[in-house]
């Protein structure tokens, strides 16, 4: 649905990825612009579950228009998707709703759960695992395994780290952010929170991923440079994520 970093691409959306398995639909992240993109491919009521990796606005902001749609245009008869939030996500979302003075039931529009990152969960036919990764707020990478054993691992937003290498070992598809251009960007008290394309490629190579895809990079960057840097790190071709791109795992 969208691959943009915090500043959305022109005509694009922030983080949002639709995963389907055996008629079950899960939306992974729901950043700015994702809900509009979602409506181009399916009814909002067709989504069975929404999984949020961390509580940065470019990964959850469109839960607000999503909730409005479920509360009003689709009415009380609409099925409520499961909303799987990271630890502390329910309280933060409730505070945001209160501060904005939103008059519709954002939390009540969904079946809200906070997932235990240390546990293995199921969502329909999908098996979910989580791994905390270094970012500016607490963030969890996730693995979605299908009924036939295919594994899709999403690194969320993170700096290079060994924990994700171990977590993603031999995955079928590893999708990693490539936010930084060519050199690390350090902020928030010397904490690094993102990767370059080369970092992402190297992490995918170390993990032994069968395929690697790069996401969360700006349209201000030259996509061919992003690709070449990622491939230099991975040692094999990489995919550049864009709206409408489909993978089979």
Locate predicted features:
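Conserved beta-strand hairpin/beta-sheet module of binuclear metal-dependent hydrolase folds
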Residues: 1-43, 140-156, 173
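Short, surface-exposed connector motifs at secondary-structure boundaries
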Residues: 22, 47, 76-79, 148-150, ...
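Active-site metal-binding motif and surrounding structural segment of the metallo-beta-lactamase
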Residues: 33-82
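Catalytic core of the metallo-beta-lactamase
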Residues: 113-170
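Cap/insert and terminal regions of metallo-dependent hydrolase folds
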Residues: 159-246
């Amino acid at each position: 649905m969208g691959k943009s970093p915090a500043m959305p691409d022109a005509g694009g959306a922030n983080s949002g990825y639709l995963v389907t398995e055996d008629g079950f639909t899960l939306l992974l992240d729901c950043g700015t612009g994702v809900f509009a993109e979602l409506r181009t491919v399916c009814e909002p009521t067709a989504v069975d579950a929404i999984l949020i990796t961390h509580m940065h606005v470019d990964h959850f902001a469109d839960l607000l228009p999503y909730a409005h749609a479920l509360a009003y245009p689709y009415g009380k008869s609409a099925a409520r998707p499961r909303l799987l939030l990271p630890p502390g996500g329910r309280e933060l979302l409730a505070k945001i709703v209160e501060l904005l003075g939103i008059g519709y039931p954002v939390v009540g529009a969904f079946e809200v759960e906070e997932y235990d990152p240390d546990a293995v969960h199921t969502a329909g036919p999908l098996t979910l695992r989580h791994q905390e990764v270094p970012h500016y707020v607490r963030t969890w990478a996730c693995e979605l395994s299908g009924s036939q054993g295919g594994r899709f691992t999403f690194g969320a937003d993170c700096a290079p780290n060994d924990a994700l290498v171990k977590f993603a070992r031999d995955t079928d598809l590893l999708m990693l952010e490539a936010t930084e251009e060519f050199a690390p960007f350090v902020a928030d008290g010397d904490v690094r929170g993102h990767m370059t394309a080369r970092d992402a490629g190297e992490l995918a190579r170390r993990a032994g991923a069968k395929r690697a895809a790069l996401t969360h990079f700006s349209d201000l960057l030259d996509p061919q440079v992003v690709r070449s840097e990622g491939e230099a790190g991975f040692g094999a071709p990489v995919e550049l994520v864009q709206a409408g791109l489909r993978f089979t795992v």
